């Protein structure tokens, strides 16, 4: 019997071919590693051939990174402004810095004659951002928000009010019924130096929409048999009457009084009607003829009395369980609020408040 000595498929021949291929790949990887090492070494010595300045630069120049700009486009912008010697100087420096992908659109305060490394480092520093900040605390009425927005952006109050008059086209929800009070969401905003009044108003309304979506405002309001506007109004009452830790209990008081057909009798609503912020109101003030005066008018006021935050919106949709009908800030200086179910207990709490108020 004879045997065929020709190697079969998968025998030693192909195995030797795979070994050769692996050897080639290993060699290529080694060459790439050597190349990268040489580049990094040359770059550290400043002899890569890329035009680059040395040092931190001097003077001041503002550059703008547009939305969607690539690192190459940012580099070109910097080079055109004289910040870096070439776009490649910035791009190569950015490639060596993983955080460079976080460079966001906006205006940056840079210096002329910077090295690529220095330019990347400065752009990653939040302090280099040229922005106009507007801080709107929770519970502010829209007049204060307009004043703060004017001061922070340099825009006139008149131009901001003109934009507010067109809020329906800038994102004001239809259920707001044209009333901007309560819908300029409290937050800290950052705007570009050339921001317009429309953009300021739109940003605040958009932020409200985000908060409303987060709490599922419209659907959950409907579950309670309320409109979204009524829930925002309740949230503004919580914001104006109590501290965050008491929001849910005050919300329960509101619901209980509405169910009993009792007037809410909230000082915050009278203050809103009068444009004041008094801790104690006179009889004349309490007799103010206004649909916002919840001493005279039963039910909720026509709309929000300030801009509530998300915690107040949540509490308005999630009142605590309880039978309270009254609450009194018995010790405002220390943030103490107490609750009562009977009128007699309420009177006792009121006496405690008067004693603490002096």
Residue map of PLM features:
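Bacterial extracytoplasmic/cell-wall-associated proteins, especially those involved in peptidoglycan
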Residues: 150-158, 169-358
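Hydrophobic membrane-insertion alpha-helices, especially the h-region
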Residues: 24-39
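Short hydrophobic beta-strand segments
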Residues: 37, 105-109, 324-328
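Generic detector of contiguous secondary-structure segments
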Residues: 22-25, 191
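N-terminal hydrophobic or amphipathic segments with adjacent small-residue motifs
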Residues: 29-31, 62, 133, 219, ...
